[in-house]
Amino acid sequence: MSCSLINEDFDLLKAAKNPGUGAKLSAGALDKLLKNFSVRNDDNLLVGFNTSDDAAVYKINDKTALISTIDFFPPVSGDPYIFGQVAAANSLSDIYAMGGEPKLALNLFCITKDMPEDMIKEILRGGFDKVYEAGAIVCGGHTIYDDSPKYGLAVNGFVHPKKILENSTAKEGDVLILTKPIGTGILLTASKADMSPPEELDRCYKIMAFLNAKARNIMVKYKINACTDITGFGLLGHLYEMGKGSGMSIEVDYKSVPIYKSVIESAEMGMMPAGVYSNRNFVGDNIVFENVPLAYQDLMFDPQTSGGLLISVDKEDAAALYEELSQALENTPCGKPAIIGLVTKRDEKILRVS
């Protein structure tokens, strides 16, 4: 995947207590911090933080809106180039989830004083190459010293004001499609104890570095009512936000959810990031599980790094969208997408998993 070498004198992965989006502040803690803040009234601010969406959107004119997002996190790999690629793909993903196209990016970089210069360059090169692949431009950034490495980007993109995809606009009857497997947090946690199969870990890195651009370019041709990308709040955390924001309930078929190999075994052994528990607490009693093994429950709360798009598509377009996505993705590291559930009329519980 890269021509860089892992530095034997500086272990990039072990420098991170919580790799990737596992370091993200929990959704519950974030809600508590922001609840007393109000967004300044501006008619051109089309999407703010009130619905916990993927990015902010500001209307420039009748044909153009600016999408603005930011993401950075600790290392997910001992290979600096792979870390740079995954961090960049994760940062770009919010633009795609909103239905937009990325254009400009700024590096956000925390380095330690003992990091080798070649390693720093490789992280930046990984990020630069991935942004270039996306058709966008890295045009600057900001770098500081810190106790542990962190990298990501602030990204700006554009979308037509009437074609914005939000996470809080799902409709009753929508079909839910997921474009990447879940389990990155558990897989990365197990890898720190050398308990993840090397071939599956390599596949995970390739999938995390895979842009959601292809899925975005296909889905915008169909009637999509809502979309988000699966990251730090886990599959069920993001589904909960979608259901709550949309005033709907959501039914999930857990056996249809695509997963990485070995993650169930790791979950059964308790090899999970702390985010699994904070995400479960965030959803609270707004969910009911029907005959779902505990390990699968934990897996669906697992914080994801550079996860797939969760697409809420009108039922009339679902079959055609699924077919086109399948043809486009089945020969990529991601493999075929999966239909994982349905949006239903709001009932007592927001989420029902069976």
Swiss-Prot record:
Name of the top EC class for this enzyme: transferase
Ligand binding (ATP): 24, 51-53, 71, 94, 141-143
Q: Describe how the cofactor binds.
A: Binds 1 Mg(2+) ion per monomer.
Enumerate the GO terms in the molecular function aspect. ATP binding; magnesium ion binding; selenide, water dikinase activity
State the Gene Ontology BP annotations: selenocysteine biosynthetic process
Query: Subunit structure, per the record?
Result: Homodimer.
**Which source organism does the UniProt entry give?**
Treponema denticola (strain ATCC 35405 / DSM 14222 / CIP 103919 / JCM 8153 / KCTC 15104)
Sorted alphabetically, which CDD domains does this protein's record hold? Answer: SelD (cd02195)
Q: What is the lineage of its organism?
A: Bacteria, Pseudomonadati, Spirochaetota, Spirochaetia, Spirochaetales
Cofactor(s), by name? Mg(2+)
Catalytic residues at 21
Q: Which PANTHER family match?
A: INACTIVE SELENIDE, WATER DIKINASE-LIKE PROTEIN-RELATED, SELENIDE, WATER DIKINASE
The entry's Mg(2+)-binding residues are: 54, 94, 229
Instruction: Return the protein name.
Output: Selenide, water dikinase
> Which cellular components does GO assign to this protein?
cytoplasm
Q: Does the keyword Magnesium apply?
A: yes
* Site feature: Important for catalytic activity: 24
